[in-house]
């Protein structure tokens, strides 16, 4: 008999050359392909010199909205041109993965997999044999799972964001950027530098677990509600998860933008 199966880690659904392909990897791959197709079409529409179509107007509105959002924080044309594509990539990849997990069939179409549960054999309260009693059980494994509901995906996004922060810092401040981490001018500055290193590492954990925790918790909530009370009752929670998916994508993108900007300015310019 199949039972409700909730796994923190993504489940492998195939193996290629010894590498496990998980349901979250497959979902992220589908989302990436769809985003590439969308932005290729968007780029082609922007080259149109005739009367703009509705799609072109939508693309121009989206791009201009992100440019204005970035400009409101960085106030530099060079940084706007540099940061806007990255922030858009973060936002659309995250929100597409968040919302992809809410589509019909995602998380609900899969296969039943038999598992074995080991139960220690006992008799009259005394262990008779150090053996096991095999009880077959079926657990449901979905073919697709939201990429951002997998800690590996959110951790990768967090590492990319923090690495880009360091790259932009070095690009704008040259070697002077590292004085925020290594500063022997005074004991206090040396201690502050150590704290800065810890904070940079903490950003990775904060980014990764905030996004993963919110999206995974939403998936668990929807799975439990649908399993216990199907049809009408889970619908308001889908609306909530649409909102949460948008907010989490926006928070990740805006925090990345703020950290990018802070890394490109000297300590004296931050205040």
Residues covered by each model-derived region:
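Selective transmembrane helix interface/packing segments
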Residues: 1-271
């Amino acid at each position: 008999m199949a039972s409700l199966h909730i796994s923190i880690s993504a489940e492998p659904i195939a193996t290629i050359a010894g590498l496990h392909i998980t349901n979250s990897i497959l979902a992220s791959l589908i989302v990436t392909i769809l985003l590439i197709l969308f932005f290729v079409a968007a780029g082609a529409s922007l080259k149109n010199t005739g009367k703009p179509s509705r799609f072109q107007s939508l693309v121009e509105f989206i791009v201009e909205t992100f440019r204005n959002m970035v400009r409101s924080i960085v106030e530099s044309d060079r940084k706007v041109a540099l940061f806007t594509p990255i922030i858009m990539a973060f936002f659309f990849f995250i929100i597409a993965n968040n919302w992809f997990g809410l589509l019909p069939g995602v998380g609900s179409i899969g296969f039943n997999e038999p598992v074995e549960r080991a139960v220690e054999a006992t008799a009259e309260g005394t262990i008779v044999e150090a053996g096991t009693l095999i009880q077959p059980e079926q657990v449901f494994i979905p073919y697709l799972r939201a990429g951002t509901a997998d800690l590996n995906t959110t951790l990768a996004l967090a590492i990319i964001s923090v690495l880009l922060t360091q790259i932009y810092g070095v690009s704008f401040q040259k070697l002077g950027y590292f004085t925020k981490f290594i500063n022997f001018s005074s004991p206090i500055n040396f201690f502050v530098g150590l704290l800065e290193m810890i904070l940079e590492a903490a950003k990775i954990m904060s980014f990764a677990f905030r996004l993963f925790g919110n999206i995974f918790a939403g998936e668990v909530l929807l799975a439990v509600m649908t399993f216990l009370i199907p049809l009408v009752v889970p619908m308001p929670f889908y609306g909530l998860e649409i909102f949460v998916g948008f907010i989490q994508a926006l928070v990740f993108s805006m925090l990345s933008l703020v950290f990018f900007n802070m890394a490109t300015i000297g300590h004296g310019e931050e205040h």
